[in-house]
Amino acid sequence: MGNIMEGKSVEELSSTECHQWYKKFMTECPSGQLTLYEFRQFFGLKNLSPSASQYVEQMFETFDFNKDGYIDFMEYVAALSLVLKGKVEQKLRWYFKLYDVDGNGCIDRDELLTIIRAIRTINPWSDSSMSAEEFTDTVFAKIDINGDGELSLEEFMEGVQKDQMLLDTLTRSLDLTGIVRRLQNGEHEEAGTGDLAAEAAG
């Protein structure tokens, strides 16, 4: 699968923002390459449940665009750009990669349910008006057009964009700007601990 950030990197963030993020990145990661362990520490994501840990690993892999096992500064900026300023289509492509845990190009019900549960463990701003199971059932009922129990990228992109409720819910559940803003305010030590470490209730 191609780089979802093609043509989108540093230019999406202002020079001031880039300087601030570069300073923070190099202060906390002097090697210039962020490992998965450092990624967890950097974002304050520690003492997580197994499902939440799997989600963090999947998020790391989607941001590691060249698949070398590290996130360098350019990948880091591209990720921030996507999270903070990405267009709907870009974000949906990234959401799809995040949900497609086994990387086979389709999302099945178990993959979606696993990630939704994990997201709710980590992200206290995510929508909780429906249980994870109810939300997963709703997604498949609305956008699994051919009824094969799997969502292709095309089904996912078209279906979500046509359904404002799904689009709004997915956007809220995967809104990492709260974590990013806390990082900007130097509060990352507290993020992802305490009650967020509890296993998500379906």
Swiss-Prot record:
Disruption phenotype: Guca1a and Guca1b double knockout mice show an increase in response to light in dark-adapted cone photoreceptors. Dark-adapted cone photoreceptors show a delayed response time and a delayed recovery time in response to light. Guca1a, Guca1b and Rcvrn triple knockout mice show rod photoreceptors have a reduced current decay during light response. SUPFAM superfamilies: EF-hand (SSF47473). Keywords: Calcium, Cell projection, Lipoprotein, Membrane, Metal-binding, Myristate, Repeat, Sensory transduction, Vision. Disulfide bonds: none annotated. One of its GO terms (molecular function) is calcium sensitive guanylate cyclase activator activity. A lipid is attached at G2 (N-myristoyl glycine). It comes from the Eukaryota. It is a lipid-anchor. The keyword Calcium applies. Ca(2+) 2 binds at D100, D102, N104, C106, E111. It is found in: Membrane; Photoreceptor inner segment; Cell projection, Cilium, Photoreceptor outer segment. Ca(2+) 1 binds at D64, N66, D68, Y70, E75. SMART domains: EFh. Stimulates retinal guanylyl cyclase when free calcium ions concentration is low and inhibits guanylyl cyclase when free calcium ions concentration is elevated. This Ca(2+)-sensitive regulation of retinal guanylyl cyclase is a key event in recovery of the dark state of rod photoreceptors following light exposure. May be involved in cone photoreceptor light response and recovery of response in bright light. Homodimer. This is Guanylyl cyclase-activating protein 1. It comes from Mus musculus.
